[in-house]
Amino acid sequence: MALSISGAGAPWWTLPDLELRMTDLCVAYTGRMKAACLVLFLALCALVAEADVAPSSVSGPRPAALDEATAGRFAALALKCLHQEYPNHILHTLTSDADARTPRELTPAFYGCYDWHSDVHAHWLLVRLMRLFPDADFTPVARAAVAQSLTPQNIAGELAYLRRDDRAYFERPYGLAWLLQLCAELRAWDDPQAAQWSNVLKPLESEAATRLENWAGKLRYPIRVGEHDQTAAAFSLVWDWAGVADDPQMRSVLAYAARRFYLADRDCPLSYEPSGEDFYSLCLGEADFMRRVLGPDLFAHWLGGFLPDIPTNPGKPWLEPAIVSDRSDPKLAHTDGLNLSRAWMLEGIADGLPASDHRVAALRAAAQLHRDAALPAVTGEHYEGGHWLAAFAVYLTSGSGLK
């Protein structure tokens, strides 16, 4: 694809001044027409990303693929907590005595693994590993466990819980985004039982997608935190779901959000990270989202302004893994998750650049450092991390979110 603007000497996605080019395109419009113009611009960026990106051949070593033995270890961690009701941390608004009920009664499909969102991504973990390793020893047990959860009755109970007026913001965006990841994994799996589960989940999937789309459309400012509320990390998960679910409207909404929130960002202070309880990086999370929306050349230019200190020399120290001080503390254990998510975000950023970009090797080297620091900690020794870290480990080691 070689789209160019009349009178311009270069394809529009390689022009150095992105904001000026967008002004050239959209300045004549106001109000809704200007918004539509900006949406179109970002949608075209997405088309370039899909059309121009060949299978990745960027420099720097790629990590080893997930093997069946390691997958079995991660599956065991998810199976251990999938239907373990207690201990449980519920985010639940009570309006009367009648609302004081057990987790199993409140959310009958996703009541284990300490909290709702962790149980959702434990289900995602099992579905992804079953899809990747259909003949593994853990697969029959995982099938039975997921089948116990994803029944029409249980999902009807989940939907009834969400649709109460006082729960309009439940698990937004983190838990709802991971629910869409679960739905995407089921959609992508060519398996009769997966198709059945996907069909059972469709009402809940539709509810989650509608809530996230409406929220992203009316959100005035991005949420720049290192925990559950971060918009960029959630948008990445939802963007990938929209591709599998063939939802161009969702992608248009997210592309417009990318333009409003992030396209003009410069000099992200990566040296200020991490905060003490982060499990997401603010800077890397944003870049990992933007590489999905922008084509490789446009993303390469944007990244140069956003993270200008990425070295072109892979031997130069750049980003060290964060240090975990106490894995028995549920908040301090977030740091293991930070190292895991940093690793997949760094790999994603490298994957989003042109094959010849000299920053790729340094990005991959930093990703490997974080991978090596984090994966040995995914043991389940402490339930504070054991109930959720395996999902992050599987997202990383199975290449989720990569081309």
Give short role names for the model-derived ranges:
Residues 58-66, 76-80, 120-136, 177-193, ...:
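Well-ordered alpha-helical scaffold segments within catalytic/enzyme domains
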Residues 12-13:
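Tryptophan (W) side chains
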Residues 37-46:
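Bacterial N-terminal signal peptides
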Residues 53, 58-111:
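Low-complexity, Ser/Thr/Pro/Gly-enriched N-terminal "stalk/linker" regions
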Residues 63-68, 103-120, 160-176, 218-231, ...:
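Solvent-exposed loop and edge beta-strand segments that line ligand/cofactor-binding
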